Design a protein with these regions (language model features):
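Short beta-strand/turn micro-motifs at beta-sheet edges
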Residues: 40-42, 96-103, 167-172
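An amphipathic, aromatic/His-enriched active-site/gating alpha helix that lines ligand/cofactor pockets
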Residues: 28-37, 56-90, 135-142, 157-180, ...
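Surface-exposed beta-loop interaction hotspot
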Residues: 77-137
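A short beta-turn/loop motif at secondary-structure boundaries
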Residues: 42-47, 147-152, 172-176
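Short, surface-exposed ligand-recognition loops at beta-strand->loop->(often short) alpha-helix junctions
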Residues: 10-21, 115-125
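Active-site-flanking beta-strand signature of metal-NTP-handling nucleotidyl enzymes
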Residues: 2-10, 52-54, 108-115, 181
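N-terminal interaction modules that seed assembly of large macromolecular complexes
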Residues: 44-56
Length: 222
């Protein structure tokens, strides 16, 4: 079964050119990994500076064998350590649902990370997939997927010297949460706005906010 590894890294704001150059080198390195199905790297669209790396592996065996040389977290530490401003977060996930519209070129994207209590996870999964299936009847989306964290493989990596990071990690790795990732891509800003004003999306968004904690990352593909 394919394994999705999502890695989020925050970097200093005034080193964008340096950060982009180093992330491209990391991307070139990852492409050589045995068992890699695909890799996507996004950078933030907001005033903050962060990068979101998505790698898909044929199965978990290939991923575990690639740890030393191709784990995005290790590559980030080796190439960008002085640019990192906070802990690096990494989730091991399984795909639940996906969509791609032929001939639509994704130019902007967003990642919705939702944390819920375990007893809500199955309900969230069913409701979210149903809502997304209704949304793709509209032509706004170019590409999208929904994934769910494998809780037993959760990895939160942080700077041991930073008290805040330690507190965050301790809170995040407990057994009282499940994480979902929904990545959405659009051909342009008009389609993105149309998507977010759709009543089906508003219904999903309201439901997710009522049962969990929602983070939204505004992204540009690299």
């Amino acid at each position: 079964m394919e394994l999705l590894v999502a890695t989020l890294a925050h970097m200093v704001r005034d080193k964008d050119d340096d950060g982009i150059t180093r992330m491209r080198l990391i991307s070139e390195t990852i492409q050589n990994a045995p068992g890699l199905v695909n890799a996507r790297i996004y950078r933030s669209r907001e005033p903050e500076s962060y990068y979101f790396i998505l790698t898909t592996w044929e199965d978990e065996d290939f991923w575990y064998k690639a740890q030393d040389r191709y784990n995005p977290t290790n590559l980030l530490r080796g190439a960008t350590e002085e640019l990192l401003t906070a802990y690096t977060e990494q989730w091991l996930m399984r795909y639940l649902w996906g969509y791609s519209r032929p001939f639509a070129q994704p130019t902007i994207a967003a990642a919705h990370i939702v944390t819920v209590r375990p007893e809500q996870a199955e309900r969230v999964e069913r409701s979210w997939i149903e809502g997304l299936r209704r949304l793709v009847t509209q032509p706004a989306l170019a590409f999208a997927f929904l994934a769910r964290e494998r809780n037993e493989d959760r990895v939160i990596l942080h700077d041991q010297s930073t008290v805040n990071n330690i507190k965050f990690a301790e809170a995040s790795i407990n057994n009282y949460s499940s994480n979902f990732l929904n990545v959405l891509s659009w051909p342009g800003e008009t389609q993105r706005k149309d998507f977010y004003t759709d009543q089906n999306y508003k219904a999903i968004s309201g439901f997710l906010s009522s049962v969990g904690v929602v983070r939204v990352l505004a992204l540009d593909p690299m």
